[in-house]
């Protein structure tokens, strides 16, 4: 992949962006955005002021310019060759709010941290959201991938998802239209989530606080929350735990370059010392190979890998064939 050239792309848009209120940043370092703190450059990063600004930008963006949405930067691994085209990063000012929206209902912006929704629910005696206190990331990503923890999932609370497509057209998707399954939704890939409407149920605030405290205490004990990590690396296979398969394959604490499978929770990959995107992805693929050779189970990535490789630093995905 060629190195990105954001100034050239920005210049090609010309006067069409003069009325855009958001921030356009050519050659934006993605290692400042992602929770892994690794990866190459975004050719052109756009941070819209609000939904209307986002729509205006999408309407003028040429169809042949790639568009990638990164949210708050969790659950993604950016490759060292960078991300071509436009990287959309929603701003906290326009998409980070959380507010009450009727009886037992909460409306949250796509990059509102999950734990802020949990806190809003607790403060107002709304049950069903305590599990969000233990999930890193933002609400848009949670709605997209049906994030869950402690036996609960996002799909249980979603009423509707507000989104904008690549053409700048607004959409409202009901829970049924989201087509939720385990760590997945059927929403079209080109939909950009802007806000999510949730509904809970009346609950005693003291009970909710106790549940949230338990979630936090457990997470601090078993997850590397103070490390540079993107969250769970692999999805749990049906009826199995990814961490257990990784542990049984001898990959707890496995190190490649500056990347490591956490010794605390071995389904968490961490940037322990200036890891590159190559280090992290190579480590993940090596773990997939080791697990398959030990158990016959082919782990699926939960973390999204974005962008292109540096020349000569490509990582071949494990295809499920044992070593000779």
From Swiss-Prot:
It is found in: Cytoplasm. Keywords: Cell cycle, Cell division, Cell shape, Cell wall biogenesis/degradation, Cytoplasm, FAD, Flavoprotein, NADP, Oxidoreductase, Peptidoglycan synthesis. One of its GO terms (molecular function) is UDP-N-acetylmuramate dehydrogenase activity. The keyword 4Fe-4S does not apply. One of its GO terms (biological process) is peptidoglycan biosynthetic process. Its EC number is 1.3.1.98. Transmembrane segments: none annotated. Its cofactor is FAD. Cell wall formation. This is UDP-N-acetylenolpyruvoylglucosamine reductase. It comes from Rhizobium rhizogenes (strain K84 / ATCC BAA-868) (Agrobacterium radiobacter).
């Amino acid at each position: 992949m060629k190195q990105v050239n954001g100034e050239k792309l920005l210049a090609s848009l010309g006067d069409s962006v003069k009325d855009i209120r958001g921030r356009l940043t050519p050659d934006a370092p993605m290692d400042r955005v992602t929770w892994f703190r690794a990866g190459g450059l975004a050719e052109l990063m756009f941070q819209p002021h609000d939904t209307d600004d986002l729509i205006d930008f999408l309407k003028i963006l040429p169809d042949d310019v790639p568009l990638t949405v990164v949210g708050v930067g969790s659950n993604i691994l950016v490759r060292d060759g960078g991300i071509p085209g436009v990287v959309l990063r929603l701003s906290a000012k326009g998409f980070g709010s959380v507010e009450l929206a009727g009886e037992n209902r909460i409306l949250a912006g796509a990059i509102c941290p999950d734990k802020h929704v949990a806190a809003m629910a607790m403060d107002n005696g709304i049950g069903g959201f305590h599990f969000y206190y233990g999930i890193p990331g933002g609400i848009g990503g949670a709605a997209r991938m049906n994030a869950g923890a402690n036996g609960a999932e996002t799909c249980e609370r979603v009423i509707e998802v507000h989104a904008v497509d690549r053409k700048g057209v607004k959409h409202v998707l009901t829970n049924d239209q989201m087509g939720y399954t385990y760590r997945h939704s059927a929403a079209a890939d080109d939909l950009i989530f802007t806000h999510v409407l949730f509904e809970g149920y009346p609950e005693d605030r003291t009970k909710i606080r106790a549940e949230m405290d338990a979630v936090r205490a457990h997470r601090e004990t078993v997850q590397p929350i103070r490390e540079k990590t993107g969250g769970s690396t692999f999805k749990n296979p049906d009826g199995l735990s990814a961490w257990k398969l990784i542990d049984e394959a001898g990959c707890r604490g496995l190190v490649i370059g500056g990347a490591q499978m956490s010794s605390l929770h071995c389904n968490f990959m961490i940037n322990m010392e200036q890891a590159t995107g190559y280090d992290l992805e190579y480590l993940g693929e090596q773990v997939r190979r080791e697990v398959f050779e030990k158990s016959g189970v082919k782990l699926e990535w939960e973390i999204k890998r974005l962008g292109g490789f540096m020349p000569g630093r490509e990582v071949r995905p494990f295809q499920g064939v044992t070593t000779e």
